[in-house]
């Protein structure tokens, strides 16, 4: 069995996939035997999807899995379902790591082989140095999303001890493969997962941990525009599904989306869901 699967769900982001996985492979050549790479393509018939497939095949190492049953960022579940490793890490297909980060992560998991916790690391901004990395997210609503970037001084020192956090962005997260609790299979489109999956682990008696050494860069810029559809009604529905599953009070969620989208019947979307 491999030690770690690293995988991404992708929708028309060939360049992200190429540079992310080539960077990973270049920096881990001495431990390839411990690693598995997976790309789950949610738009495999597009020009970019076909290019992603060709790259994965040419790499002779990255496993390509087309997935068209639904369009959703929650298809990251498929990374864990298809993993053949003891541990699994999901990353956005436009994330980069510092040298030796993957080695350190494997060493950490070797010391905690039966952990059921969910793991994150500090996110760096483009300048890399000279700022406080985002070590967590704060549980608050802003701009149609639950969670705003937060900072904890304990995340500034990459040699520091792991510490508990409430939630984080899902550009990168990891856990023991069999411990993955999964995103709700009814999620569609984009959104609804931050906070939800962390609460799900907490309700199961587990913890979300920030590993200060697990530092990552995320490309936010999209000069060609966002390639996947962003449908507000789908996002509201996802949050409603998650709130219902976890038994959360949805008052704050309703108020947020009503204030942002007065022309959308937010209550109907949520209440119709409750009747299904």
Report the location of each language-model feature:
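Conserved donor NDP-sugar-binding/catalytic core segment of glycosyltransferases
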Residues: 100-144
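Cell-envelope/extracellular polymer assembly enzymes that use nucleotide-activated donors
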Residues: 2-7, 23, 36, 196
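Glycine-rich, basic loop-to-helix element that forms the pyrophosphate-binding segment
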Residues: 67-83
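Short, acidic, metal-binding catalytic loop of nucleotide-sugar glycosyltransferases
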Residues: 22-34
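A conserved hydrophobic helix/loop-capping motif in glycosyltransferases and polysaccharide synthases
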Residues: 4-13, 20, 27, 40, ...
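Short aromatic/hydrophobic "clamp" motif used to bind/position activated sugar donors
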Residues: 88
